Amino acid sequence: MEAKAIAKYVRMSPMKVKIVLDLIRGKNVNEAFAILQYTPKDAAVVINKVLKSAVANAENNFNLDGNRLYVSEAYAGQGPTLKRFQPHAQGRAFSIKKRSSHITVIVKERD
């Protein structure tokens, strides 16, 4: 059985989020929480919140044992991009893309 949690429209680039997700994928849930606690990235705070939600979903909705859970899948997809312009000299303008992410964490029980 698996439980899933999704955070949508997170104002963070998916590329930056994937760096942290790669650290916890396949790890035991308790080990993943320890890794996220000491990871000096802004994405670690958001991923920690999503992982807590996935564990709570597993325990409350599917009656799974929290100590036997592991992160089976963790991925970040591209959300909508906000387009902004930075004015430059002589009437020029350069575009700025403020990217967002949809973060998904799936936990399963070890056999």
Swiss-Prot record:
Q: Which PROSITE patterns match?
A: RIBOSOMAL_L22
Q: Which GO terms describe its cellular component?
A: cytosolic large ribosomal subunit
UniProt KW keywords: Ribonucleoprotein, Ribosomal protein, RNA-binding, rRNA-binding
Is Lipoprotein given among the entry's keywords?
A: no
Name the GO terms of the biological process aspect.
Answer: translation
Q: Where are the transmembrane segments?
A: none
What InterPro entries would the database entry show? Answer: Ribosomal_uL22, Ribosomal_uL22_bac/chlpt-type, Ribosomal_uL22_bac/org-type, Ribosomal_uL22_CS, Ribosomal_uL22_sf
The record, for HAMAP family, names: Ribosomal_uL22_B (MF_01331_B)
Q: Which family does it belong to?
A: Belongs to the universal ribosomal protein uL22 family.
Q: How does it assemble?
A: Part of the 50S ribosomal subunit.
Q: What protein does this entry describe?
A: Large ribosomal subunit protein uL22
Protein's gene? rplV
